[in-house]
């Protein structure tokens, strides 16, 4: 969540920024009223507590002098009732303010271009030249089905729309991609590999910002009697980032760099009719996620590094891509700055998103109470959190199939993947 002090001390300015950069309308009148109530109740609570403490001390002194303390006891009891009522009201108002805070998006960094949607994103760079084919280009669905490696009918039979079954060499290529990405990030980029739960509790989802605002995007389990409800993770960002929830980290041990390969589960609410063919938009897909936990002043530098790590995957696979700086209207709820990497897909004759790398600033850390402290310093500070896809495995498979296709329908295996594929250079029927 954003810093509550922005609402307490700069309410009008913060509301204006949210309106201009996020098209988010803050109810200034309601917030001002609640904040005034909170302050008044805080003062009342502190005053009543002080008075009660004084009366309690007076009881002890009166007892020592042998005086009648009945009236003082009555006063303390009365003050206790008033104090409990004031505290209850204070908690109610604070909870109402917190509920509002949880719905407010992060404020974009100053360098983020203002815009309403993806049409106003800014291309930063391109790498690689799209291949020229001397035969009719097939899409990944046709390629995968022709070599008996992709079976969408089986996915529908087993689960429904937006599911697929991979078999044989295609399944192995998919696995090879994930292993290659993990090896690169752990052995060269310095990330710690983690294996995390695919089911998480609601506290975890609040921590990274999926709840309360985006509950419809998740697959929720039905809670068993006596157990808390769970949801399937929409990305490994959720459990991996929450590993530092309620922790005070030593500055000397930062940055923390973690990676995980997991399936991801998304309801794709609001995506009806979009990308209904193939692997581009699935309810279940694999992703290798990168997460960094850093000192506040180093997060923008870390974003460039993390994005570069995702870019290196594409370069080693020799897949043409472009790097895009998202405008304010296209960024995720909790991000303050985001780069998207878009890979070239020949069958669509366009670039499609394959990675999103974001600096979340202290937005998630405040929700999670993830802090850091320097050696010898008593004061703690909120860390900054970053995350990025390194990469979406299914979409990378799509890009490999389409960019490495041959006229006979076979697929040339990228050189860096051959050690994971029994050193074969081509897969086909």
Swiss-Prot record:
GO cellular component, one term: cytoplasm
Keywords noted in UniProt: Aminoacyl-tRNA synthetase, ATP-binding, Cytoplasm, Ligase, Nucleotide-binding, Protein biosynthesis
EC number: 6.1.1.11
Reactions accelerated catalytically: tRNA(Ser) + L-serine + ATP = L-seryl-tRNA(Ser) + AMP + diphosphate + H(+); tRNA(Sec) + L-serine + ATP = L-seryl-tRNA(Sec) + AMP + diphosphate + H(+)
Residues noted as binding L-serine in the record, renumbered to the chain: 235-237, 289, 389
Record-linked CDD domains: SerRS_core
Binding site for ATP: 266-268, 353-356
Subcellular location: Cytoplasm
InterPro entries in the cross-refs: aa-tRNA-synt_IIb, aa-tRNA-synth_II, aa-tRNA-synth_II/BPL/LPL, Ser-tRNA-ligase_type_1, Ser-tRNA-synth_1_N, SerRS_1_N_sf, SerRS_core, tRNA-bd_arm
Regions crossing the membrane: none
Class of this enzyme: ligase
Domain of life (superkingdom): Bacteria
Molecular functions (GO terms): ATP binding; serine-tRNA ligase activity
SUPFAM superfamilies, sorted: Class II aaRS and biotin synthetases, tRNA-binding arm
GO BP annotations, alphabetical order: selenocysteine biosynthetic process; seryl-tRNA aminoacylation
Pathway connected to this protein: Aminoacyl-tRNA biosynthesis; selenocysteinyl-tRNA(Sec) biosynthesis; L-seryl-tRNA(Sec) from L-serine and tRNA(Sec): step 1/1
NCBIfam families listed in its UniProt record: serS (TIGR00414)
Record family assignment: Belongs to the class-II aminoacyl-tRNA synthetase family. Type-1 seryl-tRNA synthetase subfamily.
UniProt subunit comment: Homodimer. The tRNA molecule binds across the dimer.
Its job: Catalyzes the attachment of serine to tRNA(Ser). Is also able to aminoacylate tRNA(Sec) with serine, to form the misacylated tRNA L-seryl-tRNA(Sec), which will be further converted into selenocysteinyl-tRNA(Sec).
Domain notes: Consists of two distinct domains, a catalytic core and a N-terminal extension that is involved in tRNA binding.
Entry-linked HAMAP family: Ser_tRNA_synth_type1 (MF_00176)
Protein name stated in the entry: Serine--tRNA ligase
Gene assigned in the entry: serS
């Amino acid at each position: 969540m954003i810093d509550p002090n922005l609402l307490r001390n700069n309410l009008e300015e913060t509301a204006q920024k949210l309106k201009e950069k996020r098209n988010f309308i803050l109810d200034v009148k309601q917030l001002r009223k609640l904040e005034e109530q909170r302050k008044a109740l805080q003062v009342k609570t502190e005053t009543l507590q002080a008075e009660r403490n004084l009366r309690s001390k007076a009881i002890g002194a009166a007892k020592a002098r042998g005086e009648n303390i009945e009236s003082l006891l009555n006063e303390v009891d009365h003050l206790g009732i008033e104090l409990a009522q004031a505290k209850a009201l204070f908690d109610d108002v604070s909870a109402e303010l917190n509920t509002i805070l949880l719905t407010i998006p992060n404020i974009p960094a100053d360098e983020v271009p203002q815009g309403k949607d993806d049409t106003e994103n800014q291309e930063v760079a391109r790498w690689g030249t799209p291949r020229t084919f001397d035969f009719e280009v097939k899409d990944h669905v046709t390629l995968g089905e022709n070599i008996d490696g992709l079976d969408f009918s089986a996915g529908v039979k087993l689960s429904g729309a937006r599911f697929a079954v991979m078999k044989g060499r295609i399944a192995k290529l998919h696995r090879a991609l994930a292993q290659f990405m993990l090896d690169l990030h752990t052995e060269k980029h310095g990330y710690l590999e983690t294996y995390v739960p695919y089911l998480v509790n609601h506290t975890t989802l609040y921590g990274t910002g999926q709840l309360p605002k985006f509950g419809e995007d998740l697959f929720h389990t039905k809670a068993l009697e006596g157990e808390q409800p769970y949801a399937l993770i929409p990305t490994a960002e959720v459990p991996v980032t929450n590993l530092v929830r309620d922790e005070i980290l030593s500055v000397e041990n930062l940055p923390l760099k973690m990676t995980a390969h997991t399936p991801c589960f998304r309801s794709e609410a609001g995506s009806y009719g979009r990308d209904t063919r193939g692997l581009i938009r699935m309810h279940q897909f694999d992703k290798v996620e990168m997460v960094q936990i850093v000192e506040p002043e180093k997060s923008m530098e870390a974003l460039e590094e993390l994005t570069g790590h995702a870019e290196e995957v594409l370069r080693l696979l020799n897949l043409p891509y472009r790097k895009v700086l998202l405008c304010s209207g296209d960024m995720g709820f909790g991000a303050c700055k985001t780069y998207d990497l878009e890979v070239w897909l020949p069958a669509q004759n366009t670039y499609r998103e394959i990675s999103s790398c974001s600096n979340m600033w202290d937005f998630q850390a405040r929700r999670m109470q993830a802090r850091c402290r320097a050696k010898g310093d008593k004061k703690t500070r909120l860390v900054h959190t970053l995350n990025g896809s390194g990469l979406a495995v299914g979409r990378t498979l799509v890009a490999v199939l389409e960019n490495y296709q041959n006229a006979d329908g076979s697929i040339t295996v990228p050189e860096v993947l051959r050690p994971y594929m029994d050193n074969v250079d081509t897969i086909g029927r």
